[in-house]
Regions:
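N-terminal leader/signal peptides at the extreme start of proteins
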Residues: 1-11
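Low-complexity, Gly/Pro-rich coil/beta segments used as flexible assembly/activation regions
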Residues: 58-187
Length: 187
């Protein structure tokens, strides 16, 4: 009777361990793919949100410019039209920083989209918590988002506004950067 049980066919310990190992590899592979897909989806969402922040800066610059043009040559103090002549023109540079640089220059600024006021470089930080954005909490702060005003050298009077964003995304060693250029002509 004992002899019959010894020679019965069944799963050996090695076969069971091999099956568990294969199952574990499949599970780890599936989780890795899911994690990678989640990171890609998060980067896509961050890029969309940052693009919205950049578009908001561009629209605020256009609004301030249009206010300035509407009241030219006498901008109204305390109104968006005065921001153009008192803060934007005084922050002009002769050349933009290299794209991909995550350190804003000293003449960088950001437009507070809550009240259309130009905020100085002091509110811009490169310590980004999630994605490049303008925070309108009790105090204004800009995380990885800034504007550079570049005056033209030609007889055409215009200013190119380089709107830049830089932040570190999940799973990447290099920073994500986005930017656009808005050209506005002066009267």
């Amino acid at each position: 009777m004992l002899r019959g049980k010894i020679f019965q066919k069944g799963d050996t310990l090695i076969e069971v361990l091999f099956a568990v190992t294969v199952f574990s590899l499949v599970v780890v592979g599936a989780l890795s793919i899911m994690n990678s897909s989640t990171a890609v989806a998060e980067r896509a969402l961050e890029t969309t949100l940052v693009r919205n922040q950049i578009d908001a800066q561009a629209e605020a610059l256009r609004y301030i410019h249009d206010s300035y043009i509407a009241t030219y040559p006498n901008p109204v103090v305390g109104q968006p039209s005065a921001e153009w002549s008192t803060k934007i023109v005084t922050n002009e540079a002769t050349g933009a920083t290299k794209f991909g640089t995550c350190t804003p220059p000293t003449n960088a600024f950001v437009v507070n989209t809550g009240n259309d006021k130009v905020e100085s470089r002091s509110v811009i930080t490169t310590d980004v918590q999630s994605y490049a954005q303008l925070r309108l909490n009790p105090t204004v702060s800009s995380e990885g988002l800034w504007v550079e005003a570049i005056k033209s050298n030609s007889s055409n009077k215009y200013i190119d506004f380089h709107i830049r964003a830089c932040w570190y995304s999940q799973g990447l060693n290099t920073p994500m950067t986005l930017g656009t250029i808005v050209r506005l002509y002066e009267p």
